[in-house]
Amino acid sequence: GDFFIHRNIANIIPPYKSSKTDHSTFAAIEYAVKVLKVPNFIVLGHTSCGGIKTGYSHYLKKPNKNYKFINSWLANLGAAYKNVPKTLSVKNQINFLEEENVRVSVYNLLEFPIVKKMVKNKKLSIYGLIYNISSGDIKSLKI
């Protein structure tokens, strides 16, 4: 089969009505769904994600003033960050955030009217996965 791949920092799909939009990500979604008519859409995060680690730090302390565009982009992690149990160790909080970001991104993807319609009509399936960099294992997340 064929693949159409779009990547960005921390593998974020922002909310459909976000003020911090990334038109590249939105255009890629629209192209994949409307033009290519992909039957499967995979939101794939990975362990040891530098973007997630930077985003985690972004919420623990004040954002770095030198990161204008990075700060704006990583602000999209807010919904996932709010769900991180603060009782976990820092390492486990970051691991949780890696997975939660995939879940939230899947929910955000379902806000796109065309995506919602295609899923409802069983013309599109969406999967949330985490790739473990160390082991090579792929974990399917419950969404």
Predicted regions and their residues:
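Conserved functional hotspot residues or short segments at active or partner-binding sites
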Residues: 43
